[in-house]
Every structure is written in structure tokens, then in C-alpha cells.
Amino acid sequence: MLDLTYEAPKPKVIAGAKHDWELVIGMEIHAQVSSNAKLFSGASTTFGAEPNSNVSFVDCAMPGMLPVINEFCVAQAVRTGLGLKAQINLFSAFDRKNYFYPDLPQGYQISQLYHPIVGEGEVLVEMAPGIARLVRIERIHLEQDAGKSIHDMDPNLSFVDFNRTGVALMEIVSRPDIRGPEEAAAYVAKLRQILRYLGTCDGNMQNGNLRADVNVSVCRPGQYEKYQETQDFSHLGTRCEIKNMNSMRFIQQAIDYEARRQIAILEDGGKVVQETRLYDPDKGETRSMRSKEEAHDYRYFPDPDLLPLEIEQGWVDEIAASMPELPDAKKARFMADYGVTDYDANVLTAELEAAAYFEEVARGRDGKQAANWVINELFGRLNKQGLTIADTPVKAGQLGGVLDLIASGEISGKMAKDLFEILWTEGGDPAEVAAARGMKQVTDTGAIETAVDEIIAANPAQVEKAKANPKLAGWFVGQVIKATGGKANPAAVNQIVAEKLGL
């Protein structure tokens, strides 16, 4: 396991006009369950389908249609809970959250208020190498997503697309343990990474498959410690919720603006109103959406169409037995097995596909060299062209072949980069391409000695300088490699130059 030092949350202190203030942040992450069917119907969850084409009679609340729980969605929620080291509740139940909105055909949302499927868990957020913060998870519950209202197609009409209606969501609720914008973004990034490793949510924020509601409040220094002692939320100040954030950068910007807005109100002698707000990235500010409702405003009651959900411990154990290696464990293994640095291990394990690619390249080879090539050459080229690891034209086997040619001494590092470029644009087998292009390193010491002798004979003044300052011998090495068209083995050239110059 990773050798981590746990650090108490460090609040971001914001200087107001009159006082210092501290930030307190809690988050509700809405993660769309990776499932081919919706939570209570068999309708497809395919993104980007024609409007209102993925809608069943259950989704659009036709009379007499009853919901039927999707067992796979339940398993995905359990898997998520296990991945977050959370308590799995063998008994849970669904409730109706009553409110009217055009994209909610039933007039209520099926959720889990009183008996969620997953209880308390945790997420470790590494803020610096070896330094981790613990963010506690309060609960995870299953619920339906709503549809999508569209207001910009006609100046006089609004439209509703019910394709998303009834899609399964996991709402992952944190404790108010987050103390700054950067930590909030890091928490979302770590949670997204875990969900993607688990295969329970694809984490695509652009498509709305992972959305964050951010609860922000400010308090005077020392008040948070009183909350920790008493668990009395009144010490934390009045919170405002910023809805539907789908960007790490916007999350940070919204928190920073909202904190300063609340501080200005309090220092002017006003009171912060508990409300739901939206973030406008164009203006860089939050704006009021509606007053913040409490649970009683929604008139929650148990859904009479759904029996309580009772699962067996044996089924939970089966899911636990099939759990994949998670990011922290994979990072620790990469550092131990392949000798990569903490930074490189973070980069290599950021995405599951990238970690698999690296491991295929590194297996049986120099791990540090493999990491250097994957991060600097491959990832650098992918980022430059805006591609993902799935789009790479150089497969892991091909890059491994390049490293094998370097290890055998057949090609130099410079040749390897030229070969990588050819594989990127044209493809092919590395060994065959190198042979066809004459990319073979000169290792014949006789040929190298001849080249060294010629360079030394032609540059007597440079010879005297090199003897006086051995660091200048590198000039001869460069000239020899240049004279051989870049094919001379650098190690052999260095050795022969040193011998010839008597260094």
C-alpha cells in the first residue's frame, strides 16, 4: 500500500475587509451509473440518441406502469460503496421526492432518503507527494435522473427531452471536510478516477454523467473546530448550494466567488440566505436560482410501488471478490515493481487505460525507461494532438519493440525517437522498419576508432583544450556521432575518445 502521511484539512483563509474567514465545503456528486438500461425500466441509456427515443411507458409515467428495479444498477452501487470503503446496507428502501417540474413526468423523483443503500465511507485525496487528506463520505443513494428542458430552440416555446428520465444516478454525499477550492477539485478528480477504475460511472463531465453540487459556507477561524467537537452545523455558517457543476476549473472558480460574496454580505452586517445558486462561467459569478428547500418541503414518503430492497451478504461478498485493483493500490505497485517515481506513478495511473498501456510496455523491461517513453514521448504527442490513449497509433507492443531495440544496442536513443515518429505516422513492426530504413547503430569499434582518429588529427588545437579541460571531450563525441550519421554507439564513442585523448 501507499506510504501516506495523513494531514488535517488546511482551511483556505480569505482576508475580508474586516476579518479573516475560513471556507467550509461539502459536495454531492451525481454519478450516472454505467448501465445499458435505466433504474426502473428497460429503456436504453445511450447518450446522444434522437430526443425522446429512449423512453419507456414507465419513464413517461403512463397510467398503470410500475417500476421494476434494475439489479445491475444495485450491484454497481454496491461496487462503488466497496471501492470507497463504505458500509453496505443490506436493507434499503426507495422514497418519493415530490416536486413539479416539466422534465419530471411522474411529479416525483424516486430516491432514497431514509434508508440509503450505502453508508459511511471515505476518499483519500493526495494533495502533495505522500501527503493525503481524508474526506468522509456520509452516504450513497440511488435515484432517478430527470429529463432535459430545452429553451433555445424556439423563442416562444420550451421543449422536453425525456431520454435521460429514469437513468440511474448514484448521489455520493460528502461530509463538510473540504476546506478549499483546490481540495474540492482534487476530491472530484479522485472520486472520478475511482469510479472509472470500478467501471460504475464513465465520469464524462462534458456529457453530464458526473455532476457536482457544491455546498459553500464561510466561518470565522476557530468555528470549524467547534463544529468538530459538537457536530453542531450552526458553527459553520449558512451554506449555499451551487448546482450542476461539470468542470474542475469551474468548481474552483465558483467556490472562490461564492465565498467572497458571502464574506461581503456578512461584513456589511447582512445575513447569508440559504439558497440554491448557479454558476455563470462567462461572468465568473454565481446567481440565485431558488430558495434552498429542506427535506420536509419535498414531502418524502416511502414509494408504495417498490418493496424495500433487501440484499444478502453473500451477494455483496461475490461483488467484493470481483473488485479490480484501485488507483492507490496500482500506484503503490508501480512504484514497488517498476521503480517509478511518485510523480510518474500518479501520471501513469491517472487513467485505467493509460496504466494498462504502461504495464504492457514495462513488463519484462526497464520500468523507469518505459515510464519515461510513455509519459514524455507518447503522452506528450497525444496531448499535443488532442488524442486519448485509445486513439494512439503506436500500440504498446510497438513501443515495447522500440525499447527492445535500444536495450540490444541496435539503435540509439536518437534513432529510437526517429523510429517512434515513423511508427506514429506510418505504423509497422519496429524491427522491420528499423532494418528497412538502415537505422542500425555502429558498434564496430574499429570503424569508430577510425572516425575518432580522423577528428583528432584534424583538430589539434581542440585536442589541447580537451586535455586541459576534460569536459571539452564531449565536442569530439558529438563530431564523431555526426560523422557517422548519428549511428555510432554513444557509449563506445565516449570510451574511445577518452582513451585516445588520454583522459
UniProtKB/Swiss-Prot annotation:
| Enzyme Commission numbers on file | 6.3.5.-
Q: For this entry, list what GO says about its biological process.
A: glutaminyl-tRNAGln biosynthesis via transamidation; translation
Which PANTHER family is this protein grouped with?
A: GLUTAMYL-TRNA GLN AMIDOTRANSFERASE SUBUNIT B MITOCHONDRIAL AND PROKARYOTIC PET112-RELATED, GLUTAMYL-TRNA(GLN) AMIDOTRANSFERASE SUBUNIT B, MITOCHONDRIAL
Keywords (alphabetical) are: ATP-binding, Ligase, Nucleotide-binding, Protein biosynthesis
Signal sequence: where? Answer: none
Give a yes or no for keyword Thylakoid in this entry. Answer: no
**Reported function:** Allows the formation of correctly charged Asn-tRNA(Asn) or Gln-tRNA(Gln) through the transamidation of misacylated Asp-tRNA(Asn) or Glu-tRNA(Gln) in organisms which lack either or both of asparaginyl-tRNA or glutaminyl-tRNA synthetases. The reaction takes place in the presence of glutamine and ATP through an activated phospho-Asp-tRNA(Asn) or phospho-Glu-tRNA(Gln).
Q: What is this protein called?
A: Aspartyl/glutamyl-tRNA(Asn/Gln) amidotransferase subunit B
Q: What is the lineage of its organism?
A: Bacteria, Pseudomonadati, Pseudomonadota, Alphaproteobacteria, Rhodobacterales
Superkingdom of the source? Bacteria
Pfam annotation, one family: GatB_N
Oligomeric form and interacting partners? Heterotrimer of A, B and C subunits.
| Catalyzed reactions | L-glutamyl-tRNA(Gln) + L-glutamine + ATP + H2O = L-glutaminyl-tRNA(Gln) + L-glutamate + ADP + phosphate + H(+); L-aspartyl-tRNA(Asn) + L-glutamine + ATP + H2O = L-asparaginyl-tRNA(Asn) + L-glutamate + ADP + phosphate + 2 H(+)
Q: SMART domains in the record, alphabetically?
A: GatB_Yqey (SM00845)
Tell me the protein family, please.
Belongs to the GatB/GatE family. GatB subfamily.
Gene Ontology molecular function? asparaginyl-tRNA synthase (glutamine-hydrolyzing) activity; ATP binding; glutaminyl-tRNA synthase (glutamine-hydrolyzing) activity
Question: PROSITE patterns this protein is in?
Answer: GATB
